[in-house]
Amino acid sequence: MNYTSVNKIRLWVLIVFLILYNIKCICENISDLKKRLCFNNFSNSKKKIKKKWLAKKKKNYLTIWKNKTYTTKRRNGYGKIEYKREENKKDDYNFMNTSLYLNYISNVKNFLFNKNNNKKNKIYYHKCKKSNIIEAKINDNDTLLSDEEFRNDVDRNDKEYYNIKKEYSENVCNQNRINDLSNCSVSSNNNILNECSSEVKKEMNYPLHNELYDNLNDNTIGHLKSEKCKEKYIRNFCILAHIDSGKSTLADRFLELTNTIKKKRMQEQFLDMMCLEREKGITIKLKAVRMHYNNYVFNLIDTPGHFDFYHEVKRSLNVCEGAILLIDGGKGIQSQTLNIFFELKKHDIKIIPVINKIDLSTCLYDKIKDDLINKFNFKENEILKISAKYGKNVKMLFQRIISDIPPPINTINSFFRGVVFDSFFDQYKGVVLIIKVLNGELRKKTEIFFINSAKSYIIQEVGYLVPEMKPTDVISQGDIAYVCSNIRNCDDIQISETIVNKDIIKKNNHNEFVINFKKINLGRDKNIMQRLSDEGKQYLTHHNKGEIKGDENGQVKCDENGQVKCDENGQVKCDENGQVKCDENGQVKCDENGQVKCDENGQVKCDENGQVKCDENGQVKCDENGQVKCDENGQVKCDENGQVKCDENGQVKCDKNKGEIKSFQYNEVKVDERYERNKEEIIYDHEHKKEGIFNIHKNDDLIKENIKEKENFSCSIQGNDNAIPILKKTDINIKSIAANKIEASYPSVYCNIYCVNDKKSNELEMSLNKLKLNDSSFSFKKYICETLGKGFKCGFNGLLHLNIIQERIKREYNIDTIVTAPSVNYLIRVKEKYMDKRLKEKLLEKNFDIQNMHIEQMDKTSSDDCFFFMTSNVNDIPTKNVVHSIYEPYVKTNIITPEIYQKYIMNECFKRRGIFIKKEIMNDQIIFLFEMPLSEILINFLDQIKSSTKGYGSMSYENIIIYKPSELYKIHIYINKKKIDSLSFLAHKRNYEDKSRKLVSKLKTLINPHQFLIIIQAALESKIFVSEKIKPLKKNVTAKCYGGDITRRRKLIEKQNEGKKKMFEIGKVKLPPNIFTKLFDIKSE
């Protein structure tokens, strides 16, 4: 085939494509023409149709050769000609905005029911579920037809039947435009629908008749986009599982099926963006990503599975309403699965159990399903089976997420409040905060206030993680988003920090940050001061679950037994506003016995903090009328018996002058411990004359001096000698609206990090600050060592965590470091009478309070002459005659193994001084519970379990530490008679000699030979019990002697030996940088 024939074929192919494109343009123009005819008084002239679509055809044919900007001339919905400058010509009527659509319907009505129009036209209205097409159907009487009438009329009037295509666009929905009618069934609250409709009415440019608007409000508008509607379409959830269960693979399927990531960019474990994560095949950091699926917004958080990063899981649970519990179908329930399940139960969030890897031939689906039903009390219909690798049944999981996981809880507070659960440092934007918006909305250029650090910043950028940062104009309630404020100081940010609008904060006369109620839009709740407690937490702190509406009198009636029945959790669930409506007197009436029975804890829980505490019997006793009247703080103070003494009328009243304090004697008043803890002695509010506060304190002069101004105080309870006159504080501290703090993760492993090059010590400190910002469980402080110089004492959650931090310092900041031997915190009990003055001053700074610690087998002898301190540095422990006892940390360890390997597991645990507690049998697997020394399980314990069980065993431990007394010896390492502090360690009496010998022999192989003799020794106190030597490097000084007297040879050798002795005295042994990691079996690349 020659060159000319090839060109001919190409030309014919091009002509065929041009013809097909022209046919497509003709079809589109015909549909456009029908729409234009509807807007131009519905002219049905066939001549006009032909002329217009032929003209349109010619125009399209000419413009396909160039893709430039040009001007089009068309008529808008009002009949006026407008000129529009466009790029890339598209269908002008693919989407009609609110005013245009409603104007069209009004024109339809005017055209159909015009008396001068002899011809009866019909427009049919119908909702098509499969396609996004809305068809209007209106009969002659201006009423909707039934489905049968509609079908019959369609057959008779096919030519008078018009379709209006309205494509759903999510971007338009965010602009409060009209959504598809199929979404209308989601919203069942008519009040919300009316509010949404009123917002659309304000947005319209064209005036509407009330009759038409009412009709559209009920039948056409459907679900309208407003803030209250939007929250119901948000689902915040996380994926939790043991390591290597397929979490990241499932996250990839989520990204694919929601079209969040294009196929060209898609790769395996897309959310594992760190190089270390891809190399090691594990997830190290939680990742948040925003996805869209069927008009719903999915905020997914992918979490790590290794127990060294368990703090990431805890932080995720605080911002999610649901969780997917993923189980490996090939391995079944593992140790971390148990820990995750119990943690989920603590947070009381919805759990969706999912069995993954059903595509494997070795999948144990039936066995795992039975374990979930029997062990975790799941129902059979709640358990899903999927294949994350091939995407099987993942869409079914989407439907379960929509139906089972609740949306974010709606609050009526309009001010912004968000909680920080993650952060990282960007070179250009500073500290980037990952937050969840609890209520309100946040826009750019808004000034925010950090409640805990009391600092304010101006928002530079807000947006969503998709998973890259995508800026937007506003983030609203329920969203998980990022915030940039150009924060450069990493110490200003704390995890679980609460941020609010700066506008709602002011300073009172005592230089405290308090809530400015003038700036808060209270919505439907206007009597906020009556609902606030003395801390203000009942109303402002948490997003509540709703409102319990009473009868006509606003009362909550009890059953025959005089009880208010609770759910399984012992709670009374409220509605969306979190309110219990009372009658006009603000009372809740009780039964005939005047009692409200509570749960086992003696509480009736409304929202997370809204509790009604009762006496020891779990009862609140009332007067004859069954009423309990409260003070201005909404509280009822009880006596020793847990009762409130009333007068004849069953009420606690103040005097006639609205509770003014006419006389006061200090001896008649009991001091309240709560107020004695406050540093402020008397608080006097000058802004509010009618209401104020004072705290009882032991300073008589201040009380007498300030109590003279009686008009500024009001009494809450008076008439009882033992009663304390406590007044409501009109200024609510801003910390009272802070969100619940995320549970802190305390380090379990400590070691020192030093820089190989001392000049980079400042860079090392900056890098550690940035890593701490991104990893809240990591902690450090400055430390100086005599041998290694300036460094940092760092805390980690495990050896893998330590290894990851060291690798990140090297890769991200290009700093070579030396890491010392890992250690744990020991509790030391010291005899004070044997200490000298210098040692006493050194240790008194480390005195430790043991009241909140779990210590077993403590001596009952008097501890007046002893005190405790905690340390991870062996060199801080004094000599044996000063130390009374050393307490070692133990943790409860869960080990799951197949039954055939149980003897190997038990031997390994007993070898490491484990204490057996119990074991459970689950099918052919056994769950062991041991109490293990933390120092023993850190070093290669998991590797040993994996090798003993051929990879089927798993191990995890709780973060609760129990201290037990142990016979521990302090071992020092000497190199050339010089003690190396960084190599000292504690060892148990049972195996200290074996550990020391192994350590010394390893040092011998790791230290390179020098030109002088190197002696390595291990000593217990001052007794040396292990010693090794490294022979020096020698030069053959006698090589030049070819004969002669032997004395010549001896002189040369003696001279060399003398030089070696001098070098031994003044020479320094150089230790390789990675000696500590290799010495203690920490795997390093």
Swiss-Prot record:
This is Translation factor GUF1 homolog, mitochondrial. It is found in: Mitochondrion inner membrane. PANTHER family: TRANSLATION FACTOR GUF1 HOMOLOG, CHLOROPLASTIC (PTHR43512:SF4), TRANSLATION FACTOR GUF1-RELATED (PTHR43512). PROSITE patterns: G_TR_2. GO terms for biological process: positive regulation of translation; translation. GO terms for cellular component: mitochondrial inner membrane. Promotes mitochondrial protein synthesis. May act as a fidelity factor of the translation reaction, by catalyzing a one-codon backward translocation of tRNAs on improperly translocated ribosomes. Binds to mitochondrial ribosomes in a GTP-dependent manner. The lineage of its organism: Eukaryota, Sar, Alveolata, Apicomplexa, Aconoidasida. GO terms for molecular function: GTP binding; GTPase activity; ribosome binding. InterPro entries: EF-4, EFG_III/V, EFG_V-like, LepA_C_sf, LepA_CTD, LepA_IV, P-loop_NTPase, Small_GTP-bd.
